[in-house]
Amino acid sequence: DDLFNINAGIVKLFGVTTLDVVRTQDGGTEVVEAK
């Protein structure tokens, strides 16, 4: 879901989380540790 991905990016931007949500090749989403 695009909105979820955008929100996750915003949250990471403000340092609230150390997780990053990325799109997988099959169109799903995957939560990975931020580097």
UniProtKB/Swiss-Prot annotation:
The keyword Electron transport does not apply. GO terms for biological process: tricarboxylic acid cycle. Keywords: Mitochondrion, NAD, Oxidoreductase, Tricarboxylic acid cycle. GO terms for molecular function: L-malate dehydrogenase (NAD+) activity. Belongs to the LDH/MDH superfamily. MDH type 1 family. Homodimer. This is Malate dehydrogenase, mitochondrial. It comes from Capsicum annuum var. annuum.
